[in-house]
Amino acid sequence: MASDMNRRKFLGYAAASAGAVTIVPRHVLGGAGYVAPSEKITVANIGCGTQGLTEMFGMLTAPEVQVVAVCDPNQDSSDYVEWGKDSVRSTIAAGLGRPQWRKGAGRVPGGRDVGKEVVELYYSDKAPSGGYRGCASYADFRDLLENAKDIDAVKVMTP
């Protein structure tokens, strides 16, 4: 049985294989200053109103946490209680690093669509691709607990 493999081809294949390993992005492997995706705590946030949205940034900014789902019976509302003039919207906008976020809407935003928007905007800005669409949303917490199988923890922010 003849083989077409010679020393030169073998070294070429070996070098190509070694090079492929070195192009794996650092954020995938983890290490000092990086948390590998497999090591992150996946969290669902139940409650996307005034308190829930402003509290969410504690989780979003933690490198060892990944918010993967939000839940609120309201889909998208603008009738939440305001603590001070434009305080909730401006807190969310500052957390996102987008001062113009929903500026001029005149009302306090909230609901699961707003929660999902906040999570995806925050992670999009941090993603190498510039996009992130990995946050599920649920109207009922029972559906979340039944269907979201990749959740390690749940944070409940409801009245």
Task: Report residues per predicted region.
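N-terminal glycine-/serine-/threonine-rich beta1-alpha1-beta2 phosphate-ribose binding loop
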Residues: 2-159
